[in-house]
Amino acid sequence: MTLRHSLLAVLTLGPAYGYQLHGEVVERTRRDTPLNVGQVYSTLDRLRRDGLIASAGITDDNLPLYELTDSGIIEARMHLTEPDTPDWHDMVERVLLALSLPGSHHDALIAHYRRLWEPYAGASSETLDPTGGQAQAAAEHAARLLRSAALAWLDSLPVIEPWPLRTDRRRRGRRAAEAVQPPR
């Protein structure tokens, strides 16, 4: 799932500042790769340039707030209901994000993913396979297992209560190192 769409989806909850959006995306999607806060700010700049977000004022301590424009609302809703490819990582992050947000958009998203993962006719066998068909058979087997796992995961989703934006200030930086006592 793109960071662009994750930020738009979280902003459906209301105005937020950059570091707050960073924490919300990480918490709601349970990303399997680290998210650099600099990526968040550069993506917010592009979203503003593209007319999908606008300034929503500042916090009490002068942090800029962002909110969705009408175009941003439309793009966020489309992202939360209409996946375009059956990609495992995208599906997991997008479904977890959708489940964490209020509304019934997750039902449409899950239904679309089910259709994307339904069995389909395999890849063309016109390509010469120097392994005598073993590589093609192994690839088709992997695709069947992935489809089966995706559909099983969609069938076993827990009920997750949506939650609002966190308003507590997230701590930044590294934790203070414990004092090391010199040897005696």
Report each predicted region and the residues it spans.
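Charged, low-complexity intrinsically disordered regulatory/assembly segments
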Residues: 104, 108-111, 117-184
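Basic helix-turn-helix/winged-helix DNA-binding cores
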Residues: 1-87
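Generic structural signal for hydrophobic core residues of well-folded globular domains
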Residues: 11, 98-99, 157
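A short small-residue
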Residues: 2, 95-97, 128-129
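Amphipathic alpha-helical dimerization/coiled-coil segments
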Residues: 77-122
